Amino acid sequence: MRTIPIVMAATVAALGAVHATAQGSDPNLGRSLAATCATCHGTNGVSVGEVESLAGKPKDEIVRKMQDFKSGAKPATVMHQLAKGYTDEQIQLLAGWFAAQKAK
């Protein structure tokens, strides 16, 4: 009977590894995730309005802000709700993609 919990734990661990590998192997995933940000932060993260541009910002800064929005440490009108919809891995991908874009 002890083998069932061990097998279940191993299966969950393996699925997590497959999920992480699948995310890491898709070079366009960061871009796809970032597309949802374009309405407010502009195409490629270059805002045309009063909303902060994200293009060229340091990855660590974007990650920190997203985590602060997600935890509620940073107040916002919308971002605190949106950030909760992303996993930590997705936030890393988003931040990396925006950091690689050219600021204008």
Where on the chain are the PLM-derived regions?
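Short Fe-S-cluster ligation motifs
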Residues: 67-89
